[in-house]
A protein has these predicted regions:
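Aromatic-rich, solvent-exposed beta-strand/loop patch
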Residues: 164-173, 252-258
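Short proline/glycine-enriched turn/loop motifs at strand-loop junctions of beta-rich domains
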Residues: 57-63, 156-163
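The feature marks proteins involved in alpha-glucan
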Residues: 1-49, 78-157, 180-258
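Acidic/polar N-terminal loop/beta-strand segments that form early-domain functional surfaces
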Residues: 57-59, 69, 100, 168, ...
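Short beta-strand motif preference
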Residues: 54, 66, 153, 163-165, ...
Length: 258
């Protein structure tokens, strides 16, 4: 007699999520006010008892879902543009966010799943005041980080309570893009995937006195024409043609050269 297969079939479709642990009132308040030093500790994906918690801050969105292997799982709204949920996973997976707005939908990489895009040597030299190429370490630098194209935003603001990136496509509201403090260096950093050349931006500074200011980037490679004051994401495409001269410049003693 043939044996009957009584095994339970593998479930198909997205894994259902559960309610995420609430943020503390202090963390939530500082995050929404733009005065949190480490938004990456609150947003993105993190292990918690029972799985992985996903949390996103998208103040203009109608809904946000986590996309894993092509399957969407909706996050619950916490109010104030925060969306969250816990998925029963053993480890943080590769994922994207599907964000629905009144005017359309988009699937994007989560800025808060990336490690810092500025190295320890840069931070050490900035902290000691000995960095000789600050224009490469600070400002808006288009790059590919962890395999994803985007732009690294960095600014030196040692006395700020918080810093956010405000752009033309967020209507100069920096709420959804708070930056993280990189310790005693005084540098704030955020990698924004998918943001490229031509994007207009400013830094939204939250001072220690509770005031907020929109500031142009002091290390900007390009700026708008007056009376507009925004900085513009720009990469250098200049190609030097002095390789032959550089190769032979040591052939002549410096005091004998013209």
């Amino acid at each position: 007699m043939a044996l009957k297969d009584t095994s339970i079939p593998e479930p198909s479709g997205p894994v259902p999520g559960t309610t995420a642990p609430a943020l503390s009132p202090e963390d939530r308040g500082r995050l929404l006010a733009g005065a949190h030093h480490d938004p990456h500790a609150l947003l993105g994906a993190h292990p918690v008892p029972g799985g992985i918690v996903f949390r996103a801050l998208r103040p203009f969105a109608r809904s946000v879902s986590v996309v894993i292997d092509g399957q969407r799982t909706a996050l619950a709204s916490e109010g104030d543009g925060l969306f969250s949920g816990v998925l029963p996973l053993a480890a943080i997976p590769a994922y994207t966010l599907h964000v629905a707005y009144d005017g359309g939908e988009q699937e994007v990489h989560d800025p808060y799943r990336f490690l810092p895009a500025l190295g320890e040597l840069d931070l050490h030299l900035i902290r000691e005041g000995r960095h000789e190429q600050l224009w490469q370490a600070l400002g808006a630098q288009p790059m590919t980080h962890e395999g994803v194209p985007g732009t690294r935003f960095t600014v030196w603001a040692p006395n700020a309570q918080g810093v956010r990136v405000a752009t033309d496509f967020t209507y100069w509201d920096g709420t959804q893009f708070p930056m993280r403090s990189l310790g005693a260096s005084g540098v704030w950093e955020l990698f924004l995937p998918g943001v490229g050349e031509g994007t207009a931006y400013k830094f939204e500074i939250h001072s220690r006195y509770g005031h907020r200011f929109l500031k142009a980037d002091p290390m900007a490679r390009r700026c708008e024409e007056p009376p507009n004051t925004a900085s513009i994401v720009t990469a250098s495409h200049y190609e030097w043609g002095d390789a032959e001269w550089m190769a032979h410049r040591a052939d002549t003693p410096v005091h004998e050269a013209p």
